C-alpha cells in the first residue's frame, strides 16, 4: 500500500455552525461543502488548506460514533482521524489485513464527497484512527 497523500483530517465538533468561523479564519477559506452522510449519522463540512482538507464532523444522532467520541472527550470534540488517499481501497484493506492490521471495515463503503472509504482500528495503528480513501471514478 502506498498512499498518494493525506486526504483530510477529521475533526469532531458539536456544531458546524459554531466551529466554521474558526476554521474559515484558520484556513483562510470558506467551507466549500456541507453534506449529511446518513449511514454514519454525521453531518460534514469541508475546508481546504493547500492540498489537504479539514473535515468537520457533527453528529446527527446521539448513537453515532462521532457523538460517542465527543462524549468520551468531555463534550469538546477534537481530532478524530487521519485519512490517507489510496488508489484502491479494497486492495489497501487486503494489504493491511495481510500485514496484521485490525480492520474496522472489511470492505469499502461510500463516505462524504462520494469517496470510497474504510477505517483501520486504532489498536493496530498506534492509537490513531486511520481512514483509507479512494477518489470517485
Where are these regions (language model features)?
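Long, hydrophobic N-terminal alpha-helical segment
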Residues: 1-40
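Vicinal oxygen chelate
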Residues: 1-2, 13-21, 26, 35, 45-48, 55, 61-63, 74-123, ...
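Short, conserved turn/kink motifs that form compact alpha/beta structural patches or helix kinks used as
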Residues: 53, 59-64
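Short connector loops at helix/strand junctions that flank enzyme active sites
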Residues: 42, 49-51, 74-79
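Regulatory and interaction patches adjacent to catalytic/ligand-binding sites
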Residues: 67-73
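Residues embedded in well-ordered beta-strands within globular domains across many folds
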Residues: 7-10, 83, 133
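Extracellular/lumenal glycan-associated surfaces
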Residues: 28, 52-55, 81, 133
Amino acid at each position: 500500500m502506498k498512499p498518494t497523500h493525506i486526504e483530510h483530517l477529521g475533526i469532531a465538533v458539536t456544531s458546524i455552525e459554531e466551529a466554521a468561523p474558526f476554521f474559515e479564519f484558520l484556513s483562510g477559506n470558506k467551507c466549500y461543502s456541507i453534506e449529511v452522510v446518513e449511514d454514519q449519522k454525521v453531518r460534514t463540512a469541508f475546508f481546504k488548506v493547500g492540498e489537504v482538507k479539514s473535515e468537520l464532523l457533527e453528529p446527527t444522532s446521539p448513537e453515532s460514533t462521532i457523538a460517542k467520541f465527543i462524549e468520551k472527550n468531555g463534550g469538546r470534540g477534537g481530532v478524530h482521524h487521519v485519512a490517507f488517499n489510496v488508489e484502491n481501497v479494497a486492495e489497501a484493506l487486503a494489504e493491511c489485513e495481510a500485514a496484521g492490521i485490525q480492520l474496522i471495515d472489511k470492505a469499502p463503503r461510500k463516505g462524504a464527497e462520494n469517496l470510497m472509504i474504510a477505517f483501520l482500528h486504532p489498536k493496530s495503528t498506534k492509537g490513531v484512527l486511520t481512514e483509507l480513501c479512494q477518489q470517485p471514478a
